[in-house]
Amino acid sequence: MHAHLIKLLSLSSLTAALMAAAGVARADDAQAPTFKAEPCCSLCPAAHDAKNYTTRYQQNFTTLVQAQGDWLFRTQEDLRTEFDTTPGGYRRMKELHDAFKSKGVELVVVYQPTRGLVDRNKLFPAERDKFDYDKALKNYQAMLGRFSKMGYWVPDLSPLTNEQQAHDFYFRGDQHWTPYGAQRTAKIVAETVKKVPGYSSIPKREFESHISGRMGKTGTLHNMAGQLCGTSYAVQYMDQFTTEPKGEAGDGDLFGDAGNPEITLVGTSHSGKNYNFAGFLQEYMGADVLNVAFPGGGLEGSMLQYLGSEDFQKRPPKILIWEFSPLYRLDQETIYRQMMALLDNGCEGKPAVMSASTTLKPGNNEVLVNGKNGIKDIRNGSNQIDIRFDDTSVKTLQARLWYMNGRHEDLKIEKPETSDTDGRFAFELREDEDWADQQLLALEIQGPEAGTAPQKVAAKVCKRNVFPSAAKHTAQAGL
């Protein structure tokens, strides 16, 4: 037997096997196996087709884009490069600012940077190359500048788009910021608030924030992917924070409810308690904040609820912080009609030009008619309507306003399901385009559904509030 074979036989079977395997590996080096890693959660083709986003809610997510790991983005919202509104939107925003200013309220606008601006590095290279970050950032900053020229106090949140932080600013599969994102935003906002006239006279006290638990977020983008593709994503867990006055832990007065805070926060669900944005503002401003934001409130929900409240009417704040995202259109005329009416409490305490009370039955109900006691001059541009249901849980108003020339307007106002309602709907008569000179003839209100109890309602027309008139602004001229 050859010596090398005898030597091989004397080795353990394991060693021999290893040597043999090594020999095979060397022999096959040129044909080594290759491996390909597939993404853990790829979106299905249906998610890339805008036609599949059929409901109003689903259209907020058009269209989903898969990114690294569990990250999802929306092409229309997260990856937008345009930040703008219509000339009518700018005019109304200016009028709103001037109206608040006339009541001694300074408005601070917190205009969130998009997920695309902040988290573009989470995109796959192909999508990142398609997203024009430089254009998006330039246009975002230009919009901040336009708010500022209208008179709003506007924190520059663009530095948040270039941060390298250990904790995510936004959730991977949700449009909301994390508590860490809220914290970093609040720090910048607080520096702007400290420059607002009147801040120096606001009572101060120290606050401190600490981690108080963990929250699990099943993201809205992940849920939408599940609806379209039947996929599921892991819950993302994140630290939760609580903010308390120093030395007063557990006193239950986190948002100053026992006192009269002179700073109020209105906004979207980003300002809800889950993310502690109001708490971080208190910590960095050193002052109490009344937080009236609620989940599902959208652009206007908490603002309208607050304007109609006794808190605002009797104790308006010195500083009002209004947080919202570029998702929301700023030219929604019906929203401004309500805000401007409620700023001076609708028709409360004002002489009635026309009024009536009735019980609504299913179908259209005639509530007000101009002419029963002589024809009155009720021009749209000078008047507003205040409608109150006895049932304070009513969240939807459907009305038809008739005019002397036979024209009519169908108006529908829906309050968020999550809002605390008072059964009240106050709004200016329509004055955009050529509506200002229309003469009101009648008001009809849609009654309750068949088979339900009748609804008692009172309606009143009065002269609208007089605020300083704003100069006409457009995106190009004056802004």
From Swiss-Prot:
Annotated compartments: Periplasm
Origin superkingdom: Bacteria
Disulfide bonds: C44-C229, C347-C462
One Pfam entry name: ALGX
EC number(s) recorded for this UniProt protein: 2.3.1.-
Organism field: Pseudomonas syringae pv. tomato (strain ATCC BAA-871 / DC3000)
rRNA-binding found in the keyword field: no
SGNH hydrolase-like domain as annotated region, ranges: 27-347
Residues spanning the signal sequence: 1-27
Gene Ontology CC entries for this record: periplasmic space
Domain description: Consists of two domains, with an N-terminal domain with structural homology to members of the SGNH (GDSL) hydrolase superfamily and a C-terminal carbohydrate-binding module (CBM) that may bind alginate.
Family that this chain belongs to: Belongs to the AlgX family.
Function: Plays two roles in the biosynthesis of the exopolysaccharide alginate: protects alginate from degradation as the polymer traverses the periplasm, and also plays a role in its O-acetylation. Probably has acetyltransferase activity in vivo.
Active site residues of this protein: D174, H176 (proton acceptor), S269 (nucleophile)
Keyword annotations: Acyltransferase, Alginate biosynthesis, Disulfide bond, Periplasm, Signal, Transferase
Residue ranges of the TM segments: none
Pathway(s) it belongs to: Glycan biosynthesis; alginate biosynthesis
Renumbered residue ranges of the record's region CBM domain: 348-476
GO molecular function, one term: acyltransferase activity
One record GO biological process: alginic acid biosynthetic process
Entry-linked InterPro entries: ALGX/ALGJ_SGNH-like, AlgX_C, AlgX_C_sf, AlgX_N
Annotated protein name in UniProt: Alginate biosynthesis protein AlgX
Catalytic EC class: transferase
